[in-house]
Structures are given as structure tokens and as C-alpha cells.
């Protein structure tokens, strides 16, 4: 006998086959499971023996509720998950772009039992320790790009050719090459420290400086402007790219 958790979609957020609902759409007929059905279903599932509900929203036709990309708002499933908690005695967990500060508030208030964090752990393996030790400014944030963890990278119209039978394809990160590939991209301390000049302070230049520093070298970036970031300063200008900044 062991505890059994169910990943439970509270509401389907689906308008028709292949047509998911967006966050701003509230006046539509639910094609899948609505809240009234969900309130009954969670009780049936509890009676069937499930011990915990790890909750989000959505279906394959509205996948972006369960795995929110950068276009979705933070805590997008919170309202629905907190509502369904009222209808079960099992622990209820909320997933989906959970802000850690908001998550802590809701758990402390008893409106949630826990939150589920996945992608943030791929980009920064020490993020929870940094929060606990008051080092939030050191956290490398997930930008919700899905290019590494979901194998969705595109280049000039060509899909990522990474084989889907690769067991690691959902455990990689576009921002952290060492995630599940630490043997391939292991950062090895140098035995011959050098002072290294890096021309350009864009994303590539900054990452180069970071790795060189971690290896024990002394990197120096030469940037022609008074800002680091290069073209990514423009690329991250949209309001929904707050973590890119």
C-alpha cells in the first residue's frame, strides 16, 4: 500500500475539438469538464482511493493551461484549484506558473496544501535553497519557452530533430545545458587560469563569461554600448517576457 496522487484537470478550458479557451475568455460553453462536473468527480475519485490531487486545468486541446508558456499569466490555475479543494478531504496541490511568494501566502492561509514546481527546477537546481536563504536575486528564472523541456524549438521553420525516444527530452533546459546532461557539459575547473577578453556583452558573451568564471578564469567583457544584453534587450521588451529581462 502506498499513496497515490492524481494529476487532476479541474476544468477542461476547451470550446471544441482542437479549440482551447484563452484566459480572457469567460463566456463560452465548456466542451469538456466544467466546474459542476469537477466538484462531483473529485469526490468520486477520493472515494475510489486517491490520496492527493495535483491540480491544473486544460486538455490536449488547451495544453497551455497545464504547461503555461510565457503568454499565460502567473498563477493561472490558482482560482480553480482553490475552489475544488472545498470539495475533497485529500491534499490539493496547484501547478502552473506558480509565483513562490503567492504560493506561500495561499498555503499559509490554508487555501492550498502545496504547489507543484517543475520547469523552474530544470533551469536552477538550487532555486528553493536560494529562496530559503534570502537569495532570490540570484535565481535564474524559467522563461517558459518550452524549447528544451518540451522539445519545441524551431529554427527557420524546421522542427527540432531531437529523437522523441530520447528519455531525457522532457528533462532538459534551454537556459541550463547541464540539466540531465552534466556529463556532456560538465564545468571542469581549469588548472591554468587565464584572463580572457570577450568581445560583446550579448547573451553569448555573458554566458561565456559566467562559465569562464565558474572554471576559474578571469573574464573581461568589452561591450560597445553601456548595457549588457545585446539584441535580447529588444527581444525581451514585450510585457509578457518579464523573466527574460
What residue ranges belong to the model's regions?
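Glycine-rich FAD pyrophosphate-binding loop
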Residues: 217-233
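N-terminal glycine-rich dinucleotide-binding loop that anchors FAD/FMN and/or NAD(P) in oxidoreductases
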Residues: 234-245
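Flavin-dependent oxidoreductase catalytic cores
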Residues: 1-199, 203-214, 218-219
Amino acid at each position: 500500500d502506498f499513496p497515490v496522487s492524481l494529476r487532476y484537470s479541474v476544468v477542461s478550458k476547451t470550446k471544441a475539438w482542437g479549440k482551447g479557451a484563452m484566459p480572457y475568455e469567460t463566456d463560452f460553453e465548456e466542451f469538456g469538464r466544467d466546474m459542476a462536473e469537477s466538484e462531483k468527480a473529485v469526490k468520486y475519485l477520493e472515494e475510489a482511493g486517491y490520496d492527493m490531487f495535483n491540480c491544473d486545468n486544460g486538455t490536449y486541446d488547451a495544453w497551455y493551461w497545464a504547461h503555461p508558456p510565457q503568454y499565460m499569466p502567473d498563477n493561472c490555475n490558482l482560482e480553480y484549484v482553490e475552489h475544488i479543494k472545498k470539495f475533497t478531504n485529500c491534499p490539493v496541490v496547484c501547478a502552473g506558473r506558480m509565483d513562490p511568494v503567492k504560493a506561500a501566502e495561499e498555503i499559509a492561509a490554508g487555501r492550498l496544501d502545496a504547489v507543484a514546481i517543475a520547469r523552474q527546477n530544470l533551469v536552477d537546481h538550487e532555486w528553493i535553497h536560494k529562496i530559503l536563504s534570502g537569495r532570490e536575486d540570484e535565481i535564474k528564472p524559467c522563461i517558459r519557452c518550452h524549447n528544451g523541456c518540451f522539445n519545441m524549438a524551431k529554427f527557420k521553420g524546421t522542427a527540432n530533430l531531437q529523437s522523441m525516444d530520447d528519455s531525457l527530452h522532457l528533462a532538459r533546459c534551454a537556459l541550463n545545458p547541464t540539466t540531465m546532461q552534466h556529463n556532456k557539459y560538465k564545468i571542469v575547473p581549469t588548472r591554468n587560469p587565464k584572463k580572457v577578453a570577450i568581445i560583446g556583452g550579448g547573451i553569448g558573451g555573458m554566458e561565456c563569461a559566467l562559465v569562464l568564471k565558474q572554471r576559474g578564469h578571469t573574464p573581461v567583457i568589452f561591450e560597445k554600448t553601456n548595457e549588457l544584453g545585446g539584441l535580447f534587450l529588444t527581444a525581451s521588451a514585450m510585457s509578457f517576457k518579464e523573466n527574460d529581462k
